[in-house]
């Protein structure tokens, strides 16, 4: 602290010679190459979420998402909260890689999720007007005849992240003492970054002579918080039909436990010592039992808990669900569609109550009357007017080999494919003959895309020579070192 002076002018610089470095530079988004990927209206998830969440800009009217990881799923939900119509989501794998509770939230709001699908093209003259997707086979190749197009004005690309680790790797080649944390070390949830940051801090302290130990539990917690979600399990449906109690709609083991901490009577537990296990309710009718406070509903980030209350009417119990969209058009007495966990329609009912807990930010509790046979299946609601987006009558023809791989130098996929087919296997040679990777970003965006082209051409990674990265130190204009200020006359 104190090294950077906010009042310093642009023509000054400070040399810092640290004994130890901690790099926590985060991650950058992976790009995806397809015809039309440079059209205005094609966003990375980070830029889109910055506009919507931080700047409060309604960045689209009709949005299509490519990528079913947590980033894409959560961005889609944020778009719906902002009043943006989410037309659909395409995921190339047979199952979304993000948490199932997040995918279920989108499905319950009418978003169609197309698994085993890829994007073929974004279409439009000077901006995005539609997107064309296609089903893929086991080798992720598009299946002819399965193309379909959807009208949209925005395409959101959320196909993963790459660590910003160039500085770390280069610093280690110079034998500098460097430790990394967060996504700069490995892509994981923000909760994992908190622990990798603690570990990096202790490692740096030890490198400076501290004897403070690093608790083994920290490493164990990083492993848990960084783990991939498990396969969905069969949902446990409670058999009791008396009193009031929570029903859990989460069926996938993920590192999540806020419901256990918020219950004032400590009636929600996670078996064992692993927070990835599914929660259970331990209340006993006639004994220590749920009071229906609803705290577990509104704390759950996956909206995967409902309350079923038989106390007033056992034939038509009251079901309480958490709701996070705009409520100005939702009134007591309104008809709504009730849905199961994955968005299947169970029928229609009416809203009997709306609670707005003061302790929760923009989360309300909507109460419904549901028949006893369906009450424990209800996981959410949808306004009856909500409809899933239908594909256009005909798929839009997508373009061929002119997709831009290197945006800095405007190098197309066709140019690079041609060189690969000629026998080029060295990224440095490709850079020399095509200028791909020679731009201002230093190949940070296009390198992964070029490697993907090698894979598509069937070239093993062992045959590809990586490019030579720029030196550790950043290029600096000579005038800065001379302390010279340029004027309009220069």
Task: Map each language-model feature to its residues.
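Short, surface-exposed secondary-structure boundary micro-motifs
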Residues: 205, 341-343
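Residues forming the flavin
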Residues: 1-247, 251, 262, 314-317, ...
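N-terminal cysteine/histidine-rich coordination modules
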Residues: 231-283, 289, 294, 300
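Short beta-strand-centered aromatic/proline hotspots
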Residues: 344-358
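Residue-level "contact hotspot" at macromolecular interaction interfaces
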Residues: 289, 326-329
């Amino acid at each position: 602290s104190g090294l950077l002076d906010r009042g310093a002018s642009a023509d000054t610089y400070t040399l810092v010679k640290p004994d130890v470095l901690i790099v926590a530079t985060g991650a950058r988004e992976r790009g995806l190459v397809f015809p039309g990927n440079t059209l205005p209206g094609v966003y990375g998830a980070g830029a889109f979420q910055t506009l919507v969440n931080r700047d409060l800009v309604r960045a689209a009217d009709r949005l299509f998402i490519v990528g079913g990881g947590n980033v894409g799923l959560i961005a889609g939900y944020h778009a719906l909260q902002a009043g943006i119509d989410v037309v659909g989501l395409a995921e190339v794998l047979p199952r979304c890689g993000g948490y199932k509770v997040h995918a279920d939230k989108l499905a319950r709001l009418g978003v169609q999720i197309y698994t085993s699908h890829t994007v073929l093209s974004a279409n439009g003259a000077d901006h995005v007007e539609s997107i064309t997707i296609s089903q893929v086979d086991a080798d992720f190749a598009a299946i002819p005849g399965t193309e379909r197009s959807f009208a949209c004005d925005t395409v959101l690309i959320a196909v993963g992240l790459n660590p910003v680790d160039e500085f770390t790797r280069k610093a280690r080649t110079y034998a500098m003492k460097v430790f990394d944390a967060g996504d700069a070390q490995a892509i994981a949830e923000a909760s994992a970054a908190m622990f990798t940051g603690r570990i990096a801090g202790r490692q740096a302290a030890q490198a400076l002579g501290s004897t403070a130990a690093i608790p083994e539990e920290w490493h164990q917690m990083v492993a848990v918080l960084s783990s991939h979600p498990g396969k969905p399990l069969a949902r446990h449906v409670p058999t009791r039909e008396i009193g009031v109690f929570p029903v859990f709609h989460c069926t996938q083991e993920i590192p999540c436990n806020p419901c256990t901490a918020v219950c004032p009577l400590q009636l929600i537990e996670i078996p064992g010592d692993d927070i990835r296990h599914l929660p259970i309710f331990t209340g006993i009718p006639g004994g220590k039992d749920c009071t229906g406070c609803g705290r577990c509903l509104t704390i759950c980030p996956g909206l995967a808990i409902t309350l079923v209350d038989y106390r007033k009417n056992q034939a038509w119990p009251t079901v309480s669900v958490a709701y996070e969209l705009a409520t100005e058009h939702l009134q007591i007495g309104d008809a709504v569609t009730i849905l199961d966990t994955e968005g299947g329609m169970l029928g229609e009912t009416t809203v009997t109550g709306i609670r707005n807990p003061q302790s929760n930010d923009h989360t309300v509790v909507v109460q419904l009357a549901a028949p006893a046979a369906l009450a424990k299946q209800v996981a959410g609601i949808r306004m009856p007017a909500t409809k899933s987006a239908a594909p256009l009558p005909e798929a839009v023809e997508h373009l061929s080999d002119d997709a831009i791989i290197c945006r800095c130098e405007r190098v197309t996929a066709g140019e690079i494919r041609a060189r690969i087919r000629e026998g080029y296997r060295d990224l440095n040679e490709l850079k020399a003959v095509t200028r791909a990777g020679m731009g201002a970003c230093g190949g940070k965006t296009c390198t992964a895309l070029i490697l993907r082209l090698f894979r598509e051409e069937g070239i093993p990674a062992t045959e590809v020579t990586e490019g030579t990265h720029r030196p550790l130190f950043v290029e600096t204009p000579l005038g800065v070192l001379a302390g010279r200020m340029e004027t309009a006359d220069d």
